[in-house]
From Swiss-Prot:
SUPFAM superfamilies: P-loop containing nucleoside triphosphate hydrolases
Protein name: Thiamine import ATP-binding protein ThiQ
Pfam families, per database record: ABC_tran
Lineage: Bacteria, Pseudomonadati, Pseudomonadota, Gammaproteobacteria, Enterobacterales
Gene name of this polypeptide: thiQ
Complex and partners: The complex is composed of two ATP-binding proteins (ThiQ), two transmembrane proteins (ThiP) and a solute-binding protein (ThiB).
Enzyme class, spelled out: translocase
One GO MF term attached to the UniProt entry: ATP hydrolysis activity
Length: 232
C-alpha cells in the first residue's frame, strides 16, 4: 500500500535514508531517540520534504514528487494549525473545501465527523475558546473528514495529560479502523505505541534500525530495545 524505497533526505552531514513497506489498514508506531529522523520520515511521506533520491508509492502510484496538497495523505502535528479567526465548523470544513463553500452532502460529512469526535456542540466556537484536548479533536476531525487512506501523526497529543492522551489515542485507533485508514504515528512513548500499534519501527541515525512487534520492544528482548532505554 505504502512503499518507500531508499528515500533519501540530505540533512547537513547526515544523509537520512529510509526503506519501508506498510500494508493498508496497518497501525504502525515510529519510535527512536530525539533528532534521529522520525519526523523527517513523516514529512517525506507527506511531501513536505523533497527527497534527493529514491521512490515513494501509494497503492502502486508513484508519489515521490507529488505536492502535499495532492497526496492521499493527512497529517496531524503537535501544533494543531487551527485558524484562530475561524469557528470549529469552518476549521473542519477546510478539509472538504478550502473555499468553505460546502454542499449539503459535505455539510452532513462535517457534522457526522464532529459527532464522532464528540465536538458537535462546539461548532460555533473559536479555537481560543476551547481546551487543548478539544482543539486536537477539531484538528483530528479536519484530517478524518478528508477520508484520505493514510493518516500521519507527529506526536499531536504529547502536550496532553496522560488520561486525555490515552483517550485520544483510542479515538484515533478506532476511527482509523472504521475508515480502514493506514496509520503511522511518531511517539517517544513505547507504552503509547503499544496501545494502538502492534508493529513498531525504530529510527536511529537517519535509518530504520529495527522493525517488528511492539510487544517485543516492550519486553526488552528486541535488538533495538536498548535504544529506547528498555531492558529485559
Amino acid at each position: 500500500m505504502l512503499k518507500l524505497t531508499d528515500i533519501t533526505w540530505l540533512y547537513q552531514h547526515l544523509p537520512m535514508r529510509f526503506s519501508l513497506t506498510v500494508e493498508r489498514g496497518e497501525q504502525v508506531a515510529i519510535l527512536g531517540p530525539s533528532g534521529t529522523g522520525k519526523s523527517t520520515l513523516l514529512n517525506l511521506i507527506a511531501g513536505f520534504l523533497t527527497p534527493a533520491s529514491g521512490s515513494l508509492t501509494i497503492d502502486g502510484v508513484d508519489h515521490t514528487t507529488t505536492p502535499p496538497s495532492r497526496r492521499p495523505v493527512s497529517m496531524l502535528f503537535q501544533e494543531n494549525n487551527l485558524f484562530s479567526h475561524l469557528t470549529v465548523a469552518q476549521n473542519i470544513g477546510l478539509g472538504l473545501n478550502p473555499g468553505l463553500k460546502l454542499n449539503a452532502a459535505q455539510q452532513e460529512k462535517m457534522h457526522a465527523i464532529a459527532r464522532q469526535m464528540g465536538i458537535d456542540n462546539l461548532m460555533a466556537r473559536l479555537p481560543g475558546e476551547l481546551s487543548g484536548g478539544q482543539r486536537q479533536r477539531v484538528a483530528l476531525a479536519r484530517c478524518l473528514v478528508r477520508k484520505q487512506p493514510i493518516l500521519l501523526l507527529d506526536e499531536p497529543f504529547s502536550a496532553l495529560d496522560p488520561a486525555l492522551r490515552q483517550e485520544m489515542l483510542t479515538l484515533v485507533s478506532t476511527s482509523c479502523q472504521q475508515q480502514k485508514m493506514t496509520l503511522l504515528m511518531v511517539s517517544h512513548s513505547v507504552e503509547d505505541a503499544a496501545r494502538i500499534a502492534t508493529r513498531s519501527v525504530v529510527v536511529a541515525d537517519g535509518r530504520i534500525a529495527w522493525q517488528g512487534k511492539t510487544e517485543e520492544l516492550l519486553s526488552g528482548k528486541a535488538s533495538a530495545s536498548a535504544l529506547l532505554g528498555i531492558t529485559g
